[in-house]
């Protein structure tokens, strides 16, 4: 006789505070894991970009070159370079080890909200309050953008890249997806200014958060609305949202000092993680592990699953 298979264990959620990073760079506008999750970057209102080992709580390097606050950053696939963008209207390509500016790209007419590398880290994609997305060639000496997407009617708040596709959210309420191979653009109107967009890990779904305190999950190919997630507060600020490392949960920052977790399939709010008293502006989920970074009150908090023990004991 065979016994019924045991029910799969519910995935752990990162709700145990492991470290706090005192960033000392004014307000932390964004925190981002690098590609393998071993390091993270923080963007400061004091114009600095910092590289950390968040698991040890140690600062590795500070990058100075922007003329105004740094708003977003991303790491290259081989960890040798960083890109960042700023209210100074520029995008900078950095050498990680040297701490030096490799290239400074100018062309946006207003502050640059978001930045990403393509998968090979040969192109930087940036989105600006000037309503345009610009693509910059990291390898050429060409000062101007190699491609400009200007379909948006208002500022670009968020861009993400997956294979040959660019996903962009705009204050005009549209979620736009550019297929670079086919040269096609699809738009889904969500009705409220979009603050953050993400691809699911399998790239089949799109997540968008809006200033109506709602997150929406859409089927990438059909645009069908698969889920709506509410219970957090997002009416005024550009806040981050994302999916967990195995696509089991939807996460969002909240203006009430928490991070909210929803079950992706059921849509139920399963955890309100109390981070602090102030707005939680940014978050980043580890690419493969149950580990979350949050940015609030001038610092970064590193969260792990309840069963996590550090090497050499808990």
Swiss-Prot record:
Gene3D superfamilies: YVTN repeat-like/Quinoprotein amine dehydrogenase. Keywords: Cytoplasm, Repeat, WD repeat. GO terms for biological process: mRNA splicing, via spliceosome. It is found in: Cytoplasm. GO terms for cellular component: catalytic step 2 spliceosome; cytoplasm. It holds the Pfam family WD40. CDD domains: WD40 (cd00200). InterPro entries: G-protein_beta_WD-40_rep, WD40/YVTN_repeat-like_dom_sf, WD40_repeat_CS, WD40_repeat_dom_sf, WD40_rpt, WD_repeat_MORG1. WD repeats lie at residues 23-62, 65-104, 107-146, 151-188, 189-228, 231-272, 275-313. Belongs to the WD repeat MORG1 family. PANTHER family: WD REPEAT DOMAIN-CONTAINING PROTEIN 83, WD40 REPEAT PROTEIN. Molecular scaffold protein for various multimeric protein complexes. Acts as a module in the assembly of a multicomponent scaffold for the ERK pathway, linking ERK responses to specific agonists. Also involved in response to hypoxia by acting as a negative regulator of HIF1A/HIF-1-alpha. This is WD repeat domain-containing protein 83. The lineage of its organism: Eukaryota, Metazoa, Chordata, Craniata, Vertebrata. The gene is wdr83.
